[in-house]
């Protein structure tokens, strides 16, 4: 729905900036394709309100329209999408799945609108509508004080394919642009009414200079893995590294035989389990990563990037692949989610915030140097491993949570 709305306005000549609430990698890939503009995550716990405020303020200076896609339900999580909307006074349009629903649609709309009195609730949008007459029933159920922002019919041709971690990556989705374009063309009533304009400068934001960071990474070239196996990257992470002086050089553990000429490596998460044969067969790349480590150079490996550095990785079908072998141990993919949530961890460099989300279990023969702490009291801690200048964990670090400490990981 958000992708369709972004493309709808883009097709009409507007510059659209889209943000994603919370720690997500897959939805942003789709939304970037739809809007044609870079996407950043807004997470009040990981990045803080000043960081989120700055991102929105900068986007408002260049965009005609800002869309923010929520995460889960409007009030789910702590912080939740409603918290973000309330803090920055951003109008909320609730997208409600209307499948097998009539008057209950209005009851849901009224409940969402009144659940928190301070929430700037603007109205509702009906998704997966069966027909024009079905929409009329839905519209008649909406209380008069609420606005209907339109509707989208149910259509299998615009449904985006998924797998165990969520949507397929944009690069893997067949006919993605065609699906988005069709969804945008199918939107009904979205141009009829718009919410009240948010004046960031006078109503929520004041002019502020962009935060500057010491050039701790000046002259440091960082090789960042980016391909179909490793693609879970926050733009804000790369921006912070560059702002501190680093030069980013992308490479592919799947397709390249050697590393670029770099002083440090960043192996983000992704889907190494879907590319076992190719990763296992690329002996030259594995050897070059080992040589990089043996030379005393830094490596930061997150989630799938960490699994790649183990001795072996086994998928859910029992297929096994020989990995890099820098971390003594093995991992096996699981059919069910094994950990999820926001986490913080205190390392000698400083305290980091981030999140974990994975379907694997691993055994490592070295002792962790630290364990993360879940933001939820009942969350499961994640171990952090160190081997020389290698730092590895299931955690996806959010570098803006501790920029200078993040720089130290790559030195």
Tell what function each PLM region has:
Residues 1-3, 222:
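Glycine-rich phosphate-binding P-loop
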Residues 3-88, 96-119, 132-136:
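ATP-dependent carboxylate-amine ligase catalytic core
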Residues 13-17, 219-221, 247, 323:
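Residues that mark the start of a beta-strand
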Residues 90, 146, 294-298:
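A short helix->loop->beta-strand "cap" motif at the edges of active sites that frequently abuts
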Residues 216-218, 230-240, 247, 333-336, ...:
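C-terminal and late-domain segments of enzyme folds
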Residues 218-294:
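Phosphate-binding active sites in nucleotide-utilizing proteins
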Residues 248, 272-346:
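Cysteine-nucleophile active-site neighborhood
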């Amino acid at each position: 729905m958000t992708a369709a709305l972004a493309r709808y306005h883009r097709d009409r000549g507007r510059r659209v900036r889209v943000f994603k609430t919370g720690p997500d990698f897959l939805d942003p890939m789709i939304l970037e394709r739809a809007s044609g503009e870079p996407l950043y995550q807004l997470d009040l716990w990981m990045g803080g309100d000043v960081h989120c405020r700055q991102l929105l303020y900068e986007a408002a200076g260049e965009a005609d329209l800002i869309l923010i896609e929520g995460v889960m339900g409007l009030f789910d999580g702590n912080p939740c999408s409603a918290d973000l909307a309330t803090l920055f006074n951003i109008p909320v349009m609730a997208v409600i799945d209307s499948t097998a629903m009539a008057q209950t649609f209005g009851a849901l709309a009224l409940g969402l609108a009144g659940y928190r009195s301070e929430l700037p609730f603007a109205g509702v949008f009906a998704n997966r509508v069966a027909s024009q007459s079905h929409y009329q029933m839905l519209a008649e159920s909406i209380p008069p004080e609420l606005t209907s922002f339109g509707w989208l019919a149910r259509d299998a041709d615009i449904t985006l394919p998924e797998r165990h971690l969520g949507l397929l990556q944009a690069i893997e989705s067949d006919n993605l642009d065609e699906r988005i374009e069709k969804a945008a063309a199918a939107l009904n009533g979205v141009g009829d009414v718009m919410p009240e304009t948010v004046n960031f400068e006078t109503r929520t934001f004041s002019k502020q200079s962009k935060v500057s960071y010491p050039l701790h990474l000046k002259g440091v070239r960082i090789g960042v893995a980016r391909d179909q196996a490793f693609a879970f990257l926050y733009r804000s992470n790369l921006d912070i590294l560059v702002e501190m002086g680093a030069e980013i050089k992308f490479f592919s553990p799947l397709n390249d035989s050697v590393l670029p000429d770099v002083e440090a490596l960043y192996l983000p998460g992704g889907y190494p389990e879907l590319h076992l044969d190719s990763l296992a067969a690329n002996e030259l790349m594995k050897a070059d990563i080992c040589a990089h480590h043996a030379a005393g150079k830094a490596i930061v490996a997150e989630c799938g990037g960490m699994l790649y550095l183990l001795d072996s990785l086994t998928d859910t079908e029992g297929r096994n692949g020989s990995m890099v072998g820098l971390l003594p141990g093995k991992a096996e993919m699981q059919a069910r989610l094994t950990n999820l949530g926001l986490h913080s961890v205190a390392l000698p460099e400083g305290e980091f915030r981030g999140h974990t989300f994975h379907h694997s279990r691993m055994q490592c023969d070295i002792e962790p140097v630290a364990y993360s702490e879940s933001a939820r009291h009942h969350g499961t801690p994640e171990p952090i491993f160190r081997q020389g200048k290698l730092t590895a964990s299931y955690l996806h670090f959010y570098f803006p949570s501790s920029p200078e400490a993040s720089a130290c990981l790559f030195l």
